[in-house]
Amino acid sequence: MAVNIGLNLFRHELTPAEVVKKSREDRFFAREIIDGIFTDFIEFHGDRQSGDDMSVIGGIAALNGKPVTIIAIDKGIDINDKLSKRNGSPEPWGYRKAQRLMQQANKFHRPIVTFINTPGAFPGKTAEAQGQGEAIAKSILESMKLTVPMIAIIYGEGGSGGALALATSDQVWMFQNATYSILSPEGFASILWKDSKRSDEAAGVMGLTPKDLLNKNVIEYIIPESRNHPRVFNLIRKRLDDEFTRLNELTPDELIAQRRARFRAF
Amino acid sequence: MDLYENQRSTSKIKRDASVNDRIPDGLFLACPYCGTQMYNKQLGDYRVCAKCGYGFRLQARERVALLTDNFEEMDADIEMTTPDFPGYAEKLARAKSQTDLGESVLTGVANIEGEQVALGVMDSYFMMGSLGSMTGEKITRLFEYATAHQLPVVLFTASGGARMQEGINSLMQMAKVSAAVAAHQEAGLLYLVVLTDPTTGGVTASFAMQGDVTLAEPHALVGFAGARVIESTIHEKLPKDFQRVETLLENGFVDKIVPRAELGQIIAKIVKLHHRTEI
Ligand SMILES: [Zn+2]
């Protein structure tokens, strides 16, 4: 059950279309989240095959003193940053960087936490030539085999396969004003109704809000948002630590079986 | 769950249920790839363009009839509650009656040139081969069956991508099938993918690109994002063979392009070379 925090008690509940709008606003930035929750973050670059995608930030850090691997999709802060990150749309080598860091975490028995904010994987010419589909497919397949706990947090947009690539995890959490969907409401409306202007209506029927997704067991937890960001980060830090501690008690076989069963239910 | 339930044995299914057989022989057709015009009957049994080798889209049952010596269908009638999306139930019903399938994939145990395999064939005539919950369920069960019975999986992909009407559940199928692929892989079993025209979206971004061996039919269109989406994103016209398997082969994402008539032989050969032998 989603628990409303006091702040929101006197506001009306947002409509799905309003949640979509909010999810696209610059409410939280990846680096701010990382610095707010963890200490000693050290960024690692590159996929060791073809390049370094700036839209995927990865590295290691400490969570209450314990090592974790962090992988975050970032939309960027200023206009140049946003352009270089294609508004948070990773290239195949972004997903391959993520895969490399996942394997590294697995080797050193570090839990993995991903932060997701993407309209989707980048639909580009080079992206296709470099195997965007294969990159996502492999991320999903490899994360099904990881013997370390993995928690995914969608903090803005969770767009389609580009988001799923980093969310085939033991748990998925969403910020209160985040979305997770098969495609954008605009795309949905234009494909099904041949009218992208009906996107607000589409948002209403797509079931893309955290509340909808919690009801469907697509996610486990809704993170209440607040203008007081440190409060949000403290809550996430505590919960991550608790859940990783709990998940670490499982044997690798149990962990994998549980993760696969989580998706087998759909 | 009894996997033998709902099995239907069909030996050398006749092709008379297919749309193609309803096309008169004298009808003039144009090859969707090279544009060459020809009479329907010139395509022959395999329905291949005589000029460029492009394989016209087949229905799943037609493919099975052409490819296998024996086929026992599984999970023909599993029912799932479909989401209450306006118009969806009608669309599904129409697709079912048009294709003689329960979903956009046909699964079963097949004999191909003497080799026993777990076979899945997607059907682009069934709601564009989109990935619904039942599609994912049938493919997942195929992998689970193959893992339990130590069989290789041969999967022919054809898909327009996600099943929009099913929303997030469609997305979850990519993960569900991948988990079953992972278990099959860990059992040391062969997963052979045959990419057929068209394979796109969520299917490309999951099980179509997870095979140990990846074959493709000539000139099949295979990609993640739609060409129009890409063109409007990068404001550039895409070259003719963009997202054709010949380009994917060049870029390293396909093992071999095989003309349709030779597929059975090549598949059997690859499966045979994966028989476990004591050395
Ligand atoms: Zn042709």
Curated annotation (Swiss-Prot), chain B:
A zinc finger (C4-type) spans 31-52. Gene3D superfamilies: 2-enoyl-CoA Hydratase, Chain A, domain 1. Pathway: Lipid metabolism; malonyl-CoA biosynthesis; malonyl-CoA from acetyl-CoA: step 1/1. GO terms for cellular component: acetyl-CoA carboxylase complex. GO terms for molecular function: acetyl-CoA carboxylase activity; ATP binding; carboxyl- or carbamoyltransferase activity; zinc ion binding. InterPro entries: AcCoA_carboxyl_beta (IPR034733), Acetyl_CoA_COase_Trfase_b_su (IPR000438), ClpP/crotonase-like_dom_sf (IPR029045), COA_CT_N (IPR011762). Residues 27-279 form the CoA carboxyltransferase N-terminal domain. Its EC number is 2.1.3.15. Keywords: ATP-binding, Cytoplasm, Fatty acid biosynthesis, Fatty acid metabolism, Lipid biosynthesis, Lipid metabolism, Metal-binding, Nucleotide-binding, Transferase, Zinc, Zinc-finger. It is found in: Cytoplasm. It is an enzyme of class 2 (transferase). Zn(2+) binds at residues 31, 34, 49, 52. Its cofactor is Zn(2+). It catalyses: N(6)-carboxybiotinyl-L-lysyl-[protein] + acetyl-CoA = N(6)-biotinyl-L-lysyl-[protein] + malonyl-CoA. The keyword Lipid metabolism applies. GO terms for biological process: fatty acid biosynthetic process; malonyl-CoA biosynthetic process. Acetyl-CoA carboxylase is a heterohexamer composed of biotin carboxyl carrier protein (AccB), biotin carboxylase (AccC) and two subunits each of ACCase subunit alpha (AccA) and ACCase subunit beta (AccD). Component of the acetyl coenzyme A carboxylase (ACC) complex. Biotin carboxylase (BC) catalyzes the carboxylation of biotin on its carrier protein (BCCP) and then the CO(2) group is transferred by the transcarboxylase to acetyl-CoA to form malonyl-CoA. PANTHER family: ACETYL-COENZYME A CARBOXYLASE CARBOXYL TRANSFERASE SUBUNIT BETA, CHLOROPLASTIC. Belongs to the AccD/PCCB family. This is Acetyl-coenzyme A carboxylase carboxyl transferase subunit beta. It comes from Leuconostoc citreum (strain KM20).
